């Protein structure tokens, strides 16, 4: 098929006529034979013809980022409401849901970012672009640590972390989406969960002699000390890391969960009711499966156990289904704006959350901090702590709002 630019004309009603000449052997259901020259008429593509961006995705992602910022700086002096704290070990608090929800949305976003390009753009080009993003996400927290903790230098640089895990999961999920079928990804998802369960509960830990799920002696902790060395692990322990290397395997499964749900959401041959029903059903079944597996392999965010993947993935699916139904199907959009502001610049908001609270803490009013001046005198310690945390989120939102109205969307 060839395109003849000279044959392009302006049609009535502001439409555009483009004449394509097909070889005699070429046939297509899209051809409209107007004469013996086999010319076709195609209307100009307008904004209304383009696939609509699902507002619910930005809202769900934005709500997740807002919670990530809140729970990263949940209060002052240990006066923190229990739901804003991570579980001590086994179990799951609302705070423990935030990170898996974000990785779930990474998977959903891969579908929306890559589906149209998968068949038209060289996979090597897409993978190289994903690799560049991965390197940037890896470097951001390392550079940030060197800025805020210059005395530690490279000798005590924490290598694992939230952004490094996001980076690795994003890259692996992108490659799997581009290079494998959905059926193959389903098998990889199952193999990751079962394989991780076997590694953590049946294979003896070197130097310990038996498999276990304790913080300092489980297989993941041993691998982290071996690969990164204790000086490069989480500052609170130096013996294990909640975003350790082995836990990347089930974390990738969380993103694959999101890819599966995203493929349903993007399917054009199912109506909205069917999509919503499938998502609710799948979510509920996953939650039940996670709770059953919890009896043998406890739900644990730090270990990112297989039961944790199913439980949190199911809840994320239910939450996204509810958002999709209310916002994109029923049209309830009044409350969405604050979350869209965060959701359209999600990574930027999270990165800035590591800087802005630090500099806010340096601000003095009459020789006292913002917390001591505005909150501590008027609230109980735990409520003052909560209001202070919400205030930090609000300040970050104002920064992202300026980005939003200026149409500054930083894509790493």
Which positions does each model-derived feature cover?
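Hydrophobic residues within membrane-embedded alpha helices
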Residues: 1-6, 17-18, 37, 94
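Aromatic (phenylalanine/tyrosine) cluster motif
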Residues: 3, 13, 19-22, 41
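Alpha-helical transmembrane segments and their immediate juxtamembrane cytosolic regions
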Residues: 9, 35, 40-412
């Amino acid at each position: 098929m060839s395109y003849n630019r000279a044959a392009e004309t302006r049609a009535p009603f502001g439409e555009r006529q483009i004449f394509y000449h097909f070889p005699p052997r070429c046939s297509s259901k899209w051809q409209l034979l107007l004469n013996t020259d086999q010319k076709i008429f195609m209307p100009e593509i307008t904004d209304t013809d383009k696939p609509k961006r699902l507002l619910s995705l930005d809202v769900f992602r934005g709500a997740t980022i807002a919670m990530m910022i809140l729970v990263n700086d949940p209060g002052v002096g240990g006066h923190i409401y229990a739901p804003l704290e991570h579980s001590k070990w086994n179990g799951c608090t609302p705070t423990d849901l935030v990170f898996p929800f974000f990785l779930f949305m990474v998977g959903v976003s891969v579908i929306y970012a890559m589906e149209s390009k998968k068949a038209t753009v060289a996979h090597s080009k897409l993978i190289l672009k994903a690799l560049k993003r991965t390197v940037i996400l890896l470097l951001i927290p390392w550079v940030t640590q060197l800025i805020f903790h210059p005395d530690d230098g490279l000798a005590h640089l924490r290598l694992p972390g939230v952004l490094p895990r996001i980076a690795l999961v994003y890259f692996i999920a992108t490659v799997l989406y581009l290079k494998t079928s959905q059926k193959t990804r389903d098998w990889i998802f199952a193999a990751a969960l079962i394989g991780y369960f076997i590694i953590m509960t049946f294979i003896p830990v070197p130097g310990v002699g038996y498999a276990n799920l304790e913080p300092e002696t489980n297989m993941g902790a041993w691998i982290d000390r071996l690969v990164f060395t204790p000086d490069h692990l989480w500052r609170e322990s130096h013996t294990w890391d909640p975003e350790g290397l082995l836990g990347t395997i089930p974390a990738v499964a969380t993103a694959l969960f999101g890819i599966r749900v995203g493929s349903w959401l993007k399917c054009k041959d199912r109506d909205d009711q069917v999509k919503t029903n499938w998502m609710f059903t799948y979510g509920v079944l996953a939650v039940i499966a996670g709770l059953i597996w919890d009896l043998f392999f406890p739900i644990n965010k730090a270990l990112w156990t297989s039961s944790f993947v199913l439980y949190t993935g199911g809840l994320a699916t239910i939450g996204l289904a509810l958002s999709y139904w209310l916002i994109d199907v029923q049209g309830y959009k009044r409350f969405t704006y604050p979350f869209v502001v965060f959701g359209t610049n999600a990574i930027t908001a999270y990165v800035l959350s590591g800087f802005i609270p630090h500099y806010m803490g340096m601000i003095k009013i009459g020789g006292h901090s913002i917390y001591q001046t505005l909150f501590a005198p008027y609230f109980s310690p735990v409520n003052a702590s909560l209001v202070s945390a919400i205030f930090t989120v609000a300040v970050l939102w104002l920064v992202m709002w300026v980005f939003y109205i200026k149409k500054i969307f930083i894509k790493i």
